[in-house]
A protein has these predicted regions:
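Intrinsically disordered, low-complexity Ser/Thr/Gly-rich stretches
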Residues: 220-256
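Beta-propeller domains with acidic blade repeats across secreted/periplasmic ectodomains
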Residues: 1-202, 216
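Intrinsically disordered, low-complexity segments enriched in small/polar residues
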Residues: 46, 66, 78, 134, ...
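Acidic, Ser/Thr/Gly/Pro-rich low-complexity segments and short DxT(G/T)-type signature motifs
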Residues: 190-195, 215, 231-233, 240-242, ...
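Short structured motifs
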Residues: 194, 248-250, 262-264
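Charge-rich, low-complexity amphipathic helices
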Residues: 56-60, 122, 205, 232, ...
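Hydrophobic/anchoring residues in structured secondary elements
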Residues: 3, 198-201, 227, 255, ...
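Extracytoplasmic/surface-exposed domains of secreted proteins
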Residues: 204-229, 256-292
Length: 304
């Protein structure tokens, strides 16, 4: 029911019934991504369009895909183009996202219940994704989670003991790690790391929620953060650099009353762009720095 996929390495139904897939950077796919699949969607790669001309295809047929324009520009020309829920910036968030699993352990795997974990084949890592629905569109942020697996991680599944089983191989494509294949178990130690729990869109900016209370005096400062935004080209070349990059002005940082969150107000938010956040200055109430200081939010719909 969808066209324009490039190299889907993972397909999974969400707990609420929607189907998502991961795709790998390459021709007509500017960066690796996570996307929802809806009937009639076009995901950007034109090589499979001819099959949509068969009588079994009951949706509109996309034709004349522009070569070299920015993804948000093509979306204006081709309404059927499905913008990703999450872009995975190249090398910052792996290179080859694959299988995925939602954490339905209700806290037995740690503080990220309900979030999505995605394996990466090249990086031998597991990434973390926090999705939200804004004006009927799924979008959200991705974060580093765990690196250093035996080799390329391609599948994951939660086991009956609420640990995450990760299946791996380096067959076909090289990746980090020196084993030809592997199966490893990732368990929560019971200690909660100081992390950005979620990054969500609010009018004029983003809300960060943390896994433990912050030092408000230190963290609620504009100098604690940096943000830039960029997007990608839709073209026949292999992948796309980050393009149309802009440093964004953070105008205010407002602490939530419970000291577990910050509202970051930003000038110049752009639809169809990754908003990359660096939170180097954030400190917990106990004086800890964030375990991972970067977050990458793919903004498609603005929050009302």
């Amino acid at each position: 029911t969808c066209s324009g996929l490039r190299s889907p390495a993972g397909v999974e139904a969400s707990p609420w019934g929607d189907v998502f897939y991961t795709d790998n950077q390459g021709e007509w796919c500017g960066a690796s991504k996570l996307s929802i699949m809806k009937p009639g969607d076009f995901h950007g790669h034109p090589h499979g369009i001819d099959s949509c001309k068969n009588e079994e295809w009951s949706f509109s047929v996309v034709d004349n895909v522009p070569n070299g324009k920015l993804f948000p520009e093509v979306k204006e020309e081709i309404p059927e183009l499905r913008m990703p829920a999450v872009w995975f910036p190249y090398d910052k968030m792996g290179r080859s996202p694959a299988g995925m699993a939602w954490d339905m352990t209700e806290g037995e795997f740690g503080p990220f219940a309900g979030q999505l974990f995605v394996t990466d084949q090249y990086d031998a890592s597991v990434l973390r994704v926090a999705l939200e629905e804004v004006n009927g569109n799924w979008q959200g942020a991705c974060f580093p989670f765990r690196m250093g697996f035996q080799c390329g991680a391609i599948r994951c599944e939660f086991g009956p003991d609420d640990s995450l089983l990760v299946g791996m191989t380096n067959r076909g494509w090289g990746g980090r790690g020196n084993s030809p294949f592997g199966l490893q178990r990732l368990r929560w130690t019971g200690e909660t790391p100081f992390e950005i729990h979620t990054m969500s869109a609010i009018p004029g900016g983003f809300r960060l929620r943390f896994t433990s209370k912050i030092n408000v005096d230190v963290s609620a400062q504009k100098t604690s953060f940096k943000m830039k935004s960029y997007t990608y080209k839709l073209h026949s070349g292999y992948g796309s650099p980050e393009v149309d990059t802009k440093d964004l002005n953070i105008t205010a940082v407002i602490a939530n009353e419970d000291a577990l969150g910050l509202d970051i107000m930003v000038d110049g938010l752009r639809s169809g762009y990754v908003h990359e956040l660096s939170a180097d200055g954030v400190s917990s109430a106990s004086g800890s720095s964030l375990l991972h200081k970067q977050a990458y939010y793919t903004l498609i719909e603005f929050a009302d």
